[in-house]
From Swiss-Prot:
GO terms for biological process: symbiont-mediated suppression of host innate immune response. Keywords: Activator, DNA-binding, Host cytoplasm, Host nucleus, Host-virus interaction, Inhibition of host innate immune response by virus, Metal-binding, Phosphoprotein, Suppressor of RNA silencing, Viral immunoevasion, Zinc, Zinc-finger. This is Transcriptional activator protein. A zinc finger (unnamed) spans 42-59. One of its GO terms (cellular component) is host cell nucleus. The keyword Zinc-finger applies. Residues 124-138 are annotated as: Transactivation. Strong activator of the late viral genes promoters. Enhances the expression of the capsid protein and nuclear shuttle protein. Acts as a suppressor of RNA-mediated gene silencing, also known as post-transcriptional gene silencing (PTGS), a mechanism of plant viral defense that limits the accumulation of viral RNAs. Suppresses the host RNA silencing by inhibiting adenosine kinase 2 (ADK2), a kinase involved in a general methylation pathway. It comes from Pepper huasteco yellow vein virus.
């Protein structure tokens, strides 16, 4: 016989671990930026998904636009933020009249059980005459 014999491999079995391409895909997916942090003037921080850009939200009576005018800038290490506003002042903040704007944390108001004042009070169906129901169901 002229063929040479193969020696068995000393490396661990490849069937026991994930294929390398799957590991690479998982590592890449973990590195992707999925949300963006915005630090508000009141001291709160929020996270906005990158697909939700240019959508607004209201926090403590102040409307914020999550557009490019609010962004987070890093120098050096990932934990050293410098917050930048490209517009001078608070062009991205819209205050709503009639809502207090104190910077202290307050509990939310409880929802009332009664009907809102903007809706009309409908009469009870028990107060409707029997003649009305007889005419209606003919």
């Amino acid at each position: 016989m002229t063929g040479s014999k193969k020696t068995p491999s000393t490396s661990p079995s490849k069937k026991l671990s994930s294929p390398p391409e799957v590991k690479l895909r998982h590592r890449f997916a973990k590195r992707q930026i999925r949300r963006r942090r915005i630090d508000l003037a009141c001291g709160c921080s929020i996270y906005i998904h990158i697909n939700c850009v240019n959508n607004g939200f209201t926090h403590r009576g102040t409307h914020h636009c999550s557009s490019s005018s609010e962004w987070r800038f890093y120098l050096g290490a990932s934990k050293s933020p410098i917050f930048q506003n490209t517009a001078s002042g608070d062009a991205n903040v819209h205050t709503q009249p009639g809502i207090s704007h104190s910077s202290q944390s307050k509990p939310q108001h409880e929802d009332s059980v009664g009907s809102p004042q903007s809706l009309l009070q409908l009469p009870s169906l028990d107060d409707v005459d029997d003649d009305f129901w007889a005419d209606l169901l003919k």
